[in-house]
Amino acid sequence: DGNIWGGEFFLFDGKTMERAGHLEYLPLPGGEASIKKPYRIAAAYGQYLLNEIPAAVFPREYQSELELISKQLDSGFNLAWTSSLGRLFDAASALLLGVCPAITFEAQAAIALENCVDPGITAKYGHQIIQSDGQSIVSLKEMWRQLNDDVKNGIKPGVCSAKFHNTIVDFTLAMCDNLKLKSEIKTVALSGGVFQSRALLGHVQQGLLQRG
């Protein structure tokens, strides 16, 4: 559809595959070039979802770049849209752990986010699943608002990271529940780089097994 996919839910009946849902589309300033600079993604998500870029997260030397990102969102110039879960991890990592000038290896930001998880935290952020054109869309505004509030209130990164991971698990299981009711398909396949995360994969597997 001209957008960058990456947070998709498909139904496969053995013959045909149907895209049944996805994460909501969020802006990616500069397109995939932003992958190397996760703070740009965090700024764009904050501006788009909350009309707020938390200035405390970004040093002063980044202010001119943040202003440019804001103008890109207003004009749509050199702006891609993505449903990527990997980019959501990148943005959350930048928001929680601070600006990393440039990524030097694949999944660097997501790995840093996983490494700081407080395993004793079971709380999670909110989310909403909405229906649009026959598809289930995971709305991320409430999750990002609560995450942003935690950062502003000085909640420890390990707590926020745990709540973020728990939220991903929660909406993944909720989407699987919805698609099971729709299709009666009970087998789930998990793929993509984000499921290299032990914190994420283990909890999703456990939740699926509990659901049968």
Question: Model features per residue range: what roles?
Answer:
Residues 1, 30, 91, 196-199:
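Flexible loop/turn segments at secondary-structure boundaries
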Residues 1-12:
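Gly/Thr-rich phosphate-binding beta-strand-loop-beta motif of the actin/hexokinase/Hsp70
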Residues 2-3, 19-20, 92-93:
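Short helix/loop capping segments that flank catalytic or ligand/cofactor-binding pockets
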Residues 11-13, 27, 164, 168, ...:
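Active-site proximal loops enriched in glycine and acidic residues that flank catalytic Cys/His/Asp
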Residues 11-16, 96:
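Short acidic-glycine loop/turn motifs at beta-strand connectors
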Residues 18-34, 72-77:
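Short beta-alpha connecting loops at secondary-structure transitions
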Residues 41-185, 199-209:
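A contiguous, well-structured pocket-lining segment that forms one wall/lid of small-molecule binding clefts
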Residues 192, 208-212:
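Short, intrinsically disordered, charge-balanced linker/junction segments flanking boundaries
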